[in-house]
Amino acid sequence: MSLCVGDAGALLLGPWPLTADPQGPLLDQDEESSVLEGSWSPSSSSLSSFSPPASGDAPSELLSLSWQPSDVLLTEQSTAGDVFPGMDWMTEKLDLNDFDLDSLIGSCDSEDSPGSPEDLLACLDSSMDLDLDSLPFGSADLDLPLGLDLPLPEEIKSEPLSPAPSVPSPPEEAPQDEHTEVPVLHPAGIMLSLSPSHIVVLLTPKEEQNISDCSDSDSGISVSGSPAHQSDLEPSSRAKPYSRPDPEASPALKGRVKTSSGAPKVEKKLKKMEQNKTAATRYRQKKRVEQESLNSECSELEKKNRELSEKADSLSREIQYLRDLLEEMRTAKQRKSKR
């Protein structure tokens, strides 16, 4: 059985098409029954449906793939809360040791083979043309950074991911080492781990992917097909109790506070001015009354003084009159005595 290098490269380096839809199985009932009978391999069918038409005989070779019987394959049972019904073939461990990789590489050497692994990767990328219109899920922007110079895999192993709501941040550049994890960002949450010996496919449910997308705000990952999730992220129109005030509304508020606080000050000042004015008026009235009373007393005293002065004058005249009278009487008495 021969496998073209272009097909294997498309599976390794291209956007990974094996996404699980938690709303329903990827296979119909006829395909599931054929899987149970062991007469048809869904892996070969899915691989052939996603293989690029690179050369003329590549599709025929890929359609003629026959994997080992299902009784020889190592099947791992899913956990109790498996959300992928009908996807048991994804947990099967496929052994590729029986494939003659040298002959596969030699089958693609009919054309001018690239001289370096980078040229080979560029050739494989240029020949890939996937038809994603037939997929059950909506088209999403898939990005898989290419920075690995690894040999062809000898073993394909798929494991279900434990329910951990975390998505690794998108790597800047994948270093060239023996084991590198390359995350694939799409709604089904498939993460690939490439190594020289095997390929590990890790699947997460869509609900956990949405939760991880909510928690991982720094990575900038967003899910387009979740209206409920988008409605939760919409900002509430109700103002928060400790939110910062709007800068446009703050000047009006400040002016309002200023006028409301200035009005009592002006009223208090006016009230104080009126109090001072009334106090001054009362003081002037009091002083006027006191002055008038003093003037009246002075006038009365002056009147009494005039009366007393007049009495004194009259008394002084009477006294003078009496003196004169006494003098005349003495003189008259002396005249009589002399006679």
From Swiss-Prot:
It is found in: Nucleus. GO terms for molecular function: cAMP response element binding protein binding; DNA-binding transcription activator activity, RNA polymerase II-specific; DNA-binding transcription factor activity; protein heterodimerization activity; RNA polymerase II transcription regulatory region sequence-specific DNA binding. Residues 14-62, 153-182, 209-313 are annotated as: Disordered. The keyword Transcription regulation applies. Pfam families: bZIP_1. Disulfide bonds: none annotated. Residues 268-288 are annotated as: Basic motif. Residues 266-329 form the bZIP domain. One of its GO terms (biological process) is regulation of transcription by RNA polymerase II. Transcription factor that binds the cAMP response element (CRE) (consensus: 5'-GTGACGT[AC][AG]-3') and displays two biological functions, as regulator of metabolic and redox processes under normal cellular conditions, and as master transcription factor during integrated stress response (ISR). Binds to asymmetric CRE's as a heterodimer and to palindromic CRE's as a homodimer. Core effector of the ISR, which is required for adaptation to various stress such as endoplasmic reticulum (ER) stress, amino acid starvation, mitochondrial stress or oxidative stress. Binds DNA as a homodimer and as a heterodimer. This is Cyclic AMP-dependent transcription factor ATF-4. The lineage of its organism: Eukaryota, Metazoa, Chordata, Craniata, Vertebrata. The gene is atf4.
